[in-house]
């Protein structure tokens, strides 16, 4: 699969796999968690879920702008760290009160910001691996 591909492709694919694993693991049970842990209605849990997804898909526009200013690899690295800290914060049991809700909201914001810096910029880095003439004919297979 990675035969005759640029050396960095494996590391970038592994980073993307880790990010998607964290995202889909959390998102699969998120609404159920909101309902059972906080006693929220389906509507309120759905609103929080939808707002989180909106941030996940809207904020990468800003992540691209930041990458133009500081560079793609710095954005990807910083995004991974911020996402990891957000998932870690989300995993800390904090009970059911206001503090727990605040902690969860901060964690969701961190995950959204981390994803915005990571997701789109990682794809750019994969594309740049194929700028070298010896890999240009394999560009489509890298994606």
Please describe what each predicted stretch is.
Residues 68-83, 133-138:
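Cytoplasmic membrane-interface "Motif A"-like loop-to-helix N-cap segments
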Residues 40-54, 137-143:
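Loop-to-transmembrane helix entry
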Residues 117-133:
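Intracellular juxtamembrane helix-capping segments at the cytosolic ends
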Residues 50-68, 119, 123:
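Central cavity-lining transmembrane alpha-helices of secondary-active solute carriers
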Residues 26-44, 48:
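Short amphipathic helix-loop junctions that connect adjacent transmembrane helices
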Residues 17, 86, 99-121:
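Hydrophobic core of transmembrane alpha-helices in multi-pass small-molecule transporters
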Residues 1-23, 98-100:
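Cytosolic juxtamembrane N-terminal segment immediately preceding the first transmembrane helix
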Residues 77-99, 104:
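C-terminal ends and interior cores of transmembrane alpha-helices
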């Amino acid at each position: 699969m990675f035969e005759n591909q640029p050396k960095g492709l494996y590391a970038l694919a592994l980073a993307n796999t880790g990010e998607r694993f964290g995202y889909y693991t959390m998102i699969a049970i998120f609404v159920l968690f909101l309902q059972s842990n906080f006693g929220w209605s389906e509507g309120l849990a759905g609103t929080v879920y939808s707002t989180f997804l909106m941030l996940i898909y809207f904020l990468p526009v800003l992540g691209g702008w930041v990458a133009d200013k500081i560079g793609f690899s710095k954005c990807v690295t910083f995004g991974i760290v911020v996402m990891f800290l957000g998932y870690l914060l989300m995993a800390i049991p904090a009970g059911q009160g206001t503090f727990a809700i605040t902690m969860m909201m901060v964690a969701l914001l961190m995950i959204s910001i981390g994803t915005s810096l990571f997701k789109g910029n990682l794809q750019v880095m994969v594309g740049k691996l194929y700028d070298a003439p010896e890999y240009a004919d394999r560009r489509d297979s890298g994606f």
